[in-house]
Amino acid sequence: MARVAGIDLPKNKRIDVALEYIYGIGKKNAKDVLAKVAGQIDPATRVKDLTEQQAGLLNTILQKEYKVEGELRREVAQNIHRYIEIGSYRGQRHRRNLPVRGQRTKTNRRTRRGRRKTLRGSA
């Protein structure tokens, strides 16, 4: 199993699909990364067939040019915290654990709010 960006990639998947298992890398970014190493790594290569050198090459590209995993998660959390600190509308919605992007809340808000909390004495 190849370890890229601190993640164990599934060994039987093609490398272009396996890169999507890294937080922050989707289809487009995976395709772009493989385009940068087009001479060395074929997108149809399975992860189990990668050499250590090829895995190292992927690691260096991901570290230099992309924010992935912990670094990206930390940035997103800091952005949310910043919204809360400045008291913006988005920050207020985050603080109250309500939908942030304009969805209705009269009925369909259960996903964001979580399970119902029943009060004692009410049926």
Can you describe what each PLM-predicted range is?
Residues S88-A123:
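Arg/Lys-rich, often Gly-containing low-complexity segments of ribosomal proteins
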Residues L58-R93:
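Mid-chain, well-packed structural core segment of small domains
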Residues L34-L72:
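Electropositive
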Residues V4-K11, V17, I41-T45:
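Surface-exposed, charge/polar-rich loops and edge strands
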